[in-house]
Amino acid sequence: MAAAGAAVARSPGIGAGPALRARRSPPPRAARLPRLLVLLAAAAVGPGAGGAARLYRAGEDAVWVLDSGSVRGATANSSAAWLVQFYSSWCGHCIGYAPTWRALAGDVRDWASAIRVAALDCMEEKNQAVCHDYDIHFYPTFRYFKAFTKEFTTGENFKGPDRELRTVRQTMIDFLQNHTEGSRPPACPRLDPIQPSDVLSLLDNRGSHYVAIVFESNSSYLGREVILDLIPYESIVVTRALDGDKAFLEKLGVSSVPSCYLIYPNGSHGLINVVKPLRAFFSSYLKSLPDVRKKSLPLPEKPHKEENSEIVVWREFDKSKLYTVDLESGLHYLLRVELAAHKSLAGAELKTLKDFVTVLAKLFPGRPPVKKLLEMLQEWLASLPLDRIPYNAVLDLVNNKMRISGIFLTNHIKWVGCQGSRSELRGYPCSLWKLFHTLTVEASTHPDALVGTGFEDDPQAVLQTMRRYVHTFFGCKECGEHFEEMAKESMDSVKTPDQAILWLWKKHNMVNGRLAGHLSEDPRFPKLQWPTPDLCPACHEEIKGLASWDEGHVLTFLKQHYGRDNLLDTYSADQGDSSEGGTLARGEEEEKRLTPPEVSHGDRDTQSVRPPGALGPRPALPESLHHSLDGKLQSLDGPGAHKEVGGAAPFLGVDFSSLDMSLCVVLYVASSLFLMVMYFFFRVRSRRWKVKHHHPAV
């Protein structure tokens, strides 16, 4: 995650933080650069600054880059098996692991007709629904998909002891061997060892191709790796045999394993001579034999090289300020994407959500519409009588499906103090760091805010709640584990709210130091010890020639920097945001004017991560859940408040607002009463007008 200070770039993951050096501060808007200069400056941010920047690039890497439109078609009923990495481009561990994944894909490139290495970015808006379908909670997640799978499956989880390249490569081989005979990829040769009798029969036969036999120990994977390396080559067959029969090996002249015994087309045979008995030497030797050449295998066409033509206008910001838009964008991603990866919540997960929302509702220093939404969510969750809830019910409330006036949370991601030089750097982790720092400061400066919540006498309330959230829900699993280790070491030593502020600051700087130079570090925002001297000169001192911190001044600075008085609403979206048909938010009108119309749509940071309409149908909920939700909405809206009429709910194919529906009901009741009154009125009058006929007496 990234430091809430906008001065130190803190890495993605629980360790990344924002750092801006003064010399790199963008020029003030007042300069009014001509459009051409603005575009040139934006392009100078780098080729990866556009929304299309990803960890893996189709056409450049050996990795098969999948998305929501291709993943099911690729893995369903495929003639090859698949190993897919579901990752998030903001995840620090995912960024650090990307070179290993690229190297793995290149290393097993020749295996592609049997098993393919792919990746899918769950951070991209278009992919979030499919990641939810595949039940992806944490990043990176590795899933195997067998060949010829006809029905939808979420795949098999990677079960290796670690994620080193060799380990993953060996588990790929195990996965291929676990295929049944009928479901094994057609291009995959048999990987089981042959018996000595089979070797003798091969020696006696002549053919039109070479036969290579790799002799190895039972625990070795080298033979199977060489077999798979030679899949795309014709005029050669590779198999393997174990070293169990020592006498047989001596007869062939095999004195050590691994060794490769080659049978030539003319019937001659013998050991091949390589410098080192390694996979690369064996495979290279066999590929270079006369008449051994690559054959044409039917492979799906991989996407062409991506062209990144997007230009993103840099949002200027003051590194000494905190921006509401960063906090609200983080809340949007947290509530609508990260938590939404869990289809339902129960037990400890539900308790963690309730406590986290309680802390947010009481301490979040943002704008009133956002605070009101958090308060509504907190009261509703607190009143639930259920032990398990579907998360779609929470989404309905967050998305304001009941159209309550006065509540709003942006459905856009837009980073300002958390923007990175590339789209996969900083962003959400930075926002989460800022949010946590802000909550610790609010708990200290407004101690009465938590009265009545059960947290009022707990100086560790924010830290422990944050700790449980990161451990339970934060997408970067490895980052969460690192944070848990730090919490176990010293979080229990926190005895006051001020100590909580300093504890989080120290741990954040510790993470900064650990991740400095990591691939997840943004070169434009290096990870430094924060606050830097230019932001807080009084925070730094020197004792006996050694630089140190003045923690008293640091505490004062943190309270000022993360205090509500330091929050700026610049760039923040309003309920009438342009994406929803209203006016532009402050700061955006000029930005739109400076951005060329033909590329203005390319800024992924300003796109909706998950529009309410894409959230899927609302599940059938228990009646008590509906009543609880409706009751809380009414109580929060107030007795005299009215519901918005701008948002309409579809009914029989026609859009009716809440007011329209209410008027229909009133009109229906009034019409029914009127008809009943008229019916009785005419019935009584008909009796009064009725003529009585008397029969004559006889």
Curated annotation (Swiss-Prot):
Pfam families: Evr1_Alr, FAD_SOX, QSOX_Trx1, Thioredoxin
EC top class named in words: oxidoreductase
Reaction equation(s) it catalyzes: 2 R'C(R)SH + O2 = R'C(R)S-S(R)CR' + H2O2
InterPro entries membership: ERV/ALR_sulphydryl_oxid_sf, ERV/ALR_sulphydryl_oxidase, QSOX_FAD-bd_dom, QSOX_FAD-bd_sf, QSOX_Trx1, Sulfhydryl_oxidase, Thioredoxin-like_sf, Thioredoxin_domain
Protein name in the entry: Sulfhydryl oxidase 2
Cofactor: FAD
Glycosylation, residue list: 77, 178, 218, 266
Segments of this protein annotated with the region Disordered: 570-624
Gene Ontology process terms (BP): protein folding
Membrane topology according to the record: Single-pass membrane protein
Domain Thioredoxin: 34-178
Sequence similarity: Belongs to the quiescin-sulfhydryl oxidase (QSOX) family.
Presence of the UniProt keyword Transmembrane helix in the record: yes
